């Protein structure tokens, strides 16, 4: 981007309007409880004076050769949401599990049951990822754990699927925990939105990219389930 800025600064007579370059940290969002990334830059006026009529984002990628560029119209990068589930059971001695409610067993079944949301509860043609990345529970090898915490991420490329997932998760957790006599707390946080590339802008820039790079070096991309808070700029 710096190279492009340098070239454009030398050809100012060809520019009819204003071009603004944004160099943003924390493109996958700031740490929990902090401000940062695209939302903070917007809040601090990065898109004001002048206000852009269109915005384009660039990412480097090891999957493309030098001199190539990848592009995709429509839904391109997934929305990213996060969740924390706390399973609550009842402690007992490991030799007498029938006297307790094993939060580890309940949590393990919840992890597996949540995967059926993708395979059995949502349209199989709509991409969805439910990943549990952290499991913490128990404090002694011979004691039935009374609490297990699960944390994970949800990725979606369709806003309706995204809207439905929290309720489907609650239904799943209700069913599993009730079978074992356990309970749970569920915290769901919506984070970055879907990156949706305007098809008209993509078509307009494709012609230029092919002129400069050649048809063979403009690569159509599949959708990605990774996320990028560039989507905040698109909502302004």
Regions found by a protein language model. Name each.
Residues 2, 8-134, 139-143, 228:
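Histidine/acidic-residue-rich, glycine-tolerant segments that coordinate divalent metal ions
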């Amino acid at each position: 981007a710096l190279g492009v800025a340098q070239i454009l600064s030398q050809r100012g007579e060809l520019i009819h309007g204003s071009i603004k370059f944004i160099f943003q940290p924390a493109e996958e969002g700031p740490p929990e409880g902090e401000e940062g990334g695209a939302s903070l830059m917007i809040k601090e006026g990065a898109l004001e004076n002048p206000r852009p009529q269109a915005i384009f984002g660039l990412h480097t990628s090891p999957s493309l050769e030098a001199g190539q560029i990848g592009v995709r119209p429509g839904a391109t990068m997934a929305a990213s949401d996060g969740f924390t589930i706390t399973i609550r059971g009842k402690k007992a001695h490991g030799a007498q599990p029938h006297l307790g409610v094993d939060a580890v067993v309940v949590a393990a079944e919840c992890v597996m049951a949540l995967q059926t949301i993708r395979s059995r509860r949502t349209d199989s043609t709509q991409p969805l990822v439910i990943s549990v990345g952290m499991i913490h529970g128990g404090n002694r090898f011979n004691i039935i754990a009374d609490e297990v915490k699960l944390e994970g991420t949800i990725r979606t490329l369709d806003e309706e699927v995204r809207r439905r997932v929290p309720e489907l998760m609650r239904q799943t957790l209700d069913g599993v925990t009730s079978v074992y006599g356990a309970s749970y707390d569920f915290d769901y946080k919506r984070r970055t939105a879907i990156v949706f590339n305007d098809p008209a802008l993509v078509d307009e820039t494709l012609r230029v990219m092919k002129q400069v790079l050649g048809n063979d070096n403009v690569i159509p991309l599949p959708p990605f389930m990774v996320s990028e808070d560039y989507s905040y700029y698109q909502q302004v």
